[in-house]
Design a protein with these regions (language model features):
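Rossmann-like NAD(P) dinucleotide-binding subdomain of oxidoreductase/dehydrogenase enzymes
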Residues: 137-283, 410
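Conserved C-terminal structural/oligomerization subdomain of aldehyde/semialdehyde dehydrogenase
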Residues: 44-47, 235, 371-373, 380-495
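A short hydrophobic/small-residue beta-strand
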Residues: 185-187, 365, 450
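Short, well-ordered beta-strand elements within core beta-sheets of diverse protein domains
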Residues: 45-52, 69-73, 161, 272-276, ...
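ALDH superfamily catalytic-core signature
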Residues: 237, 245-390, 453
Length: 495
């Protein structure tokens, strides 16, 4: 049970200026520059982080390469790597509340969700891949009896990882844990707006015994640090979660440099499809509201398009409005808050523009959408439901990354499929129906990396998360994630 007094004791702890973590040491940026960290809770600065440049990235990559070639981690026995990664998981769990509160101060996620999704998920991820280290085998090819064909899986070398601001510890672990499990060294760039929890993770990894240089963390802007990692000739693989525009740029950087493998988890405009035979409309309304309004809609798999069969449209919209209206938006470190803050002033301004544009284009505002709690100095927005949305409207096509839900009515199953697949994205989706046949047909028909049936969200580490089409390539989570961080090598042996 979360204790409000413990949360309150952590929320005001001073945060010392944060340095870069390179070659197992904390050091300032080469240029001596720093960045103010603004809390979305009250709009005030509460910390400073180093602003790295190209020289710092080069130092981090050099340290990572030296560690990889030296073999302190890459050639460590799997049992040894496993032991250290399990220790990392234990330390994350031991400091879970501290990490969660720090992350909330950084990006505004409501504390109940943050505790589970950030340190809780990160610890589970490190434990999952630690246990996988000694359970992934090579292969023996079916060759002629005069030849032995062995297929080895090797670490790729140096991995660059660029992580977003919305769930930095969770998504960071999704990149780091499988990359480390495979024996790689890593250069990690957190988001400029949310770096603090990943810097703490670096300290935890060092305490757990991860050899120096195996993990390096460089903070700063995407235009400087991100570009320097993506264009570096000695980075072998780049893993990124973020916007489509940046993803395209990273592919260009790969082509301009060493043709490094680039894995992208990008945006979404995920359809949540409700048929008239959905088993429980109250549950549909509650789960669908959580699917778009948790973390103020700042979730890549958010169910931002609600496609509702026309015969139940009015009833479901009414129930959904009731659920949304009951959500308490407020201080994300207050256990009474259901929804926290928008991550930044810029993000809030963008959300408000989307809301105004939706009304201008003819959508009907059912509830919410306005900025609230402005007197706190923080960045808060009431969850918004827009009805009578057509597929031509901006709100139906573009990712908002905020608490704005577009409701679109449909008549027949074919219409639902057409609408679901009408965007450039293909990350997540859901289908609500009592018909097993309908469920199976929709799973096949909807072009998305994950199709929920009679639920939304909550998939665990046992299944991959990745997108289709312009939602990206490659997958986080599951054993399939290891494929991104390994290379195949064939030994062809004449007997």
């Amino acid at each position: 049970m979360l204790d409000q007094s413990k949360i309150d004791s952590l929320r005001t702890l001073p945060v010392t200026p944060q340095s870069l973590f390179i070659a197992g040491r904390w050091r300032p940026a080469a240029a001596g520059e720093e960045i103010d960290v603004i809390s979305p809770i009250d709009g005030k600065p509460f910390a400073r982080i180093a602003r790295a440049g190209r020289d710092d990235v080069d130092a981090a990559v050099t340290a990572a390469r030296k560690a990889y070639e030296g073999g302190s981690w890459s050639r460590m026995a799997p049992a040894g790597r496993k032991k250290i990664m399990l220790r990392i998981a234990d330390l994350i769990e031991a400091r879970a509340l501290e990490l969660a509160v720090l992350g909330v101060r950084d990006n505004g996620t409501e504390i109940g969700m943050a505790l589970k999704a950030e340190p809780g998920s990160a610890a589970a991820t490190f434990r999952y891949y630690a246990e996988a280290i000694d359970k992934v085998y090579g292969e023996i090819a079916p060759t002629a009896d005069t030849v032995l064909g062995l297929i080895h899986r090797e670490a790729v070398g140096v991995v660059g990882a660029i992580v977003p601001w919305n769930m930095p510890l969770m998504i960071g672990a999704w990149k780091l844990a499988p990359a480390l499990a495979a024996g790689n060294s890593v250069v990690l760039k957190p988001a400029e707006a949310a770096s603090l929890s990943l810097l703490q993770l670096a300290a935890i990894c060092a305490e757990a015994g991860l050899p120096e240089g195996v993990l390096n963390v460089v903070t700063g802007s995407g235009s400087q640090v991100g570009e320097a990692i993506a264009t570096h000739m000695d980075v072998d693989v780049l893993a990124f979660t973020g916007s489509n525009a940046v993803g395209r740029r990273l592919l260009e950087y790969s082509a301009r440099s060493n043709l490094k493998r680039v894995y992208l988890e990008l945006g979404g405009k995920s359809p949540n499809i409700v048929f008239a035979d959905a088993p429980d409309l109250d549950r549909v309304a509650k789960v669908s509201a959580n699917g778009i309004f948790r973390n103020s809609g700042q979730v890549c798999v958010a169910g931002s398009r609600l496609l509702v069969q026309r015969s139940i449209h009015d009833e479901l919209v009414e129930r959904l409005a009731h659920v949304a209206g009951a959500l308490k938006v407020g201080d994300p470190l207050d256990l009474a808050s259901d929804v926290g803050a928008i991550a930044s002033a810029a993000q809030l301004a963008g959300n408000l523009r989307f809301a105004r544009q939706a009304e201008d284009e003819g959508a009907r505002l059912v509830s919410g959408g306005e900025r609230i709690l402005e007197e706190t100095g923080g960045f808060y927005q009431r969850p918004a439901i827009f009805d009578r949305v057509s597929q031509e409207m901006t709100l139906a096509r573009e990712e908002v990354f905020g608490p704005l839900l577009a409701v679109i009515a449909f008549d027949e199953e074919a219409d639902a499929v057409r609408l679901a697949n009408a965007t450039e994205y293909g990350l997540a989706s859901a289908v609500w129906t009592s018909s097993l046949s309908t469920a199976h047909r929709m799973v096949r028909a909807v072009r998305a990396g994950i199709v929920h049936v009679n639920t939304y969200g909550g998939s665990d580490l046992t299944v991959p998360l990745g997108g289709h089409r312009q939602s990206g390539n490659g997958h986080d989570k599951s054993l399939h994630a290891l494929e991104k961080y390994t290379a195949l090598k064939t030994a062809w042996i004449q007997l």
